[in-house]
């Protein structure tokens, strides 16, 4: 689990670690009592190649959309850079991605092999930070890559989640 958001947030959120003299430390079941939507959380130390972010949740019964943003802080004025915005649009079954740098949105990417989300069903999104790109997995299947548009990965230190979903776990 080295490099995961859970590990980096464990101390900040007061998560206990279990250990015994015969085994290495084990991450306790993580419970975030404040996983309400909209959600805004800090990524300790920012991102770097090798770091992963896990988002688990359940899509609402009649969803329109939801989005996951990794941002460079949570400033509204001036607006923080958005390193990646993942937006699930249920009406046209699109999983869109884009970035906003210095106040300007880039070109939106939309091609996917299939739409992975189903109303009233659980999902698991993993965002793997690699040197040139983010690699996005949904329910264990790689769905697409998104090449970095923000130069300083360590500046990407905030996760924001909003829309028609319930969060069950972040890691």
From Swiss-Prot:
Gene3D superfamilies: 2.60.120.200. GO terms for molecular function: carbohydrate binding. InterPro entries: ConA-like_dom_sf, Galectin-like, Galectin_CRD. Residues 38-170 form the Galectin domain. Keywords: Lectin. The keyword Cell cycle does not apply. This is Galectin-related protein B. Does not bind lactose, and may not bind carbohydrates. The keyword Secreted does not apply. PROSITE patterns: GALECTIN (PS51304).
């Amino acid at each position: 689990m080295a490099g995961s958001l859970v590990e980096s947030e464990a101390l900040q959120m007061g998560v206990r670690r279990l250990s015994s003299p015969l085994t290495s430390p084990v991450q306790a079941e993580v419970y975030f009592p404040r996983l309400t939507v909209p959600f805004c959380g800090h990524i300790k130390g920012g991102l770097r190649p090798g770091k992963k972010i896990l988002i688990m949740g359940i899509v609402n019964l009649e969803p329109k959309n939801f989005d996951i943003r990794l941002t460079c802080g949570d400033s509204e004025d001036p607006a923080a850079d958005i390193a990646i915005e993942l937006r699930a649009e249920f009406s046209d079954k699109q999983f869109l991605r884009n970035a906003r740098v210095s106040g300007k949105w880039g070109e939106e990417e939309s091609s996917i092999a299939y739409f992975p989300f189903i109303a009233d069903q659980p999902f698991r999104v993993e965002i793997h930070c690699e040197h040139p790109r983010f690699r996005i997995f949904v329910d264990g299947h790689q769905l697409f890559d998104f090449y970095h548009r923000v130069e300083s990965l360590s500046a990407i230190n905030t996760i924001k989640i909003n829309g028609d979903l319930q969060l069950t776990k972040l890691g």
